[in-house]
Amino acid sequence: MKLRFLSTLIVLLLGVKAATAQTNMQVFYDFGSDRKFVTMTLEMFKADKWGNTYFFIDHDFNYTDNNGNKDHCAAPGGTYLEIARCFNFWQNTKLAPLSLHAEYNGGITRNYPISSAWLVGVDYFLHDQSFRNTLNLKALYKNIHRTSSKVPMQFTAVWTCKDFLGLKCLTFDGFADFWWENHGCDFQPDGTCKEKRTVFITEPQLWYNVGDLFGCENLNVGTEIELSNNFGSTAGFKCRPCLGVKWVF
């Protein structure tokens, strides 16, 4: 669950005079057949005169003890972090939509670590005249610790559509990632697995600002659908729907 509102907030780069920060928290229940647990995400975006900083932390409440007993309320069973910095020293020029991008990813699940990854590249920002519809496109060199890949690259798209389909308070946003990574999936008891070389994941979200109805614009309710191929330890295509709430601080 990443980059939920980056493409919306990056418009601040075009006119911000002082540092501006936005933070939100999302709580989702994942209905995926191999999930069925709660994930909490904390996000922060801050724009400044040199660009912007973004990070999120996911906590999966899927803890299982050594005897295989599920105790999801005891503690997070997995945690994942992404932190990214866009450098843009030319915000008042025609090159303002183009930024240099640096990023770190890493975490751990209840079964295996998520290897540290370092990414560097470029980010290009597109928008309509109102800035209510935005798109970020990223081309990144990706180095994953102790992992090989045929092409050490990741391509990312991040989008936001405010007042989606002309409906006030409805927002459609999300991201899509594609990268190369040699990794094992569908591990069997005898230790065998399927070898995969690419990964794709997208998480479109639909949010309704229900709080606007009673004077509390912080509160949103909505849905997310994770669509992935060879993501994590699961081979092939997977669809995992979620329902959740978001509070914008």
Each model region followed by its residue ranges:
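Sec-dependent N-terminal signal peptides
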Residues: 4-15
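Short loop/turn motifs that connect adjacent beta-strands in outer-membrane beta-barrel proteins
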Residues: 19-22, 50-54, 88-99, 126-135, ...
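Short glycine/proline- and aromatic-enriched beta-strand/turn motifs that initiate or cap beta-hairpins
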Residues: 21-65
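Residues that define the transmembrane beta-barrel architecture of outer-membrane proteins
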Residues: 36-40, 75-81, 114-120, 149-155, ...
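Residues on the lipid-exposed face of transmembrane beta-strands in outer-membrane beta-barrel proteins
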Residues: 42-46, 83-87, 120-126, 139, ...
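Outer-membrane beta-barrel translocator domains and adjoining extracellular loop/strand segments
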Residues: 66-72, 111-115, 148-150, 184-192, ...
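Outer-membrane beta-barrel transmembrane domain signature
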Residues: 142-220, 227-230, 247-249
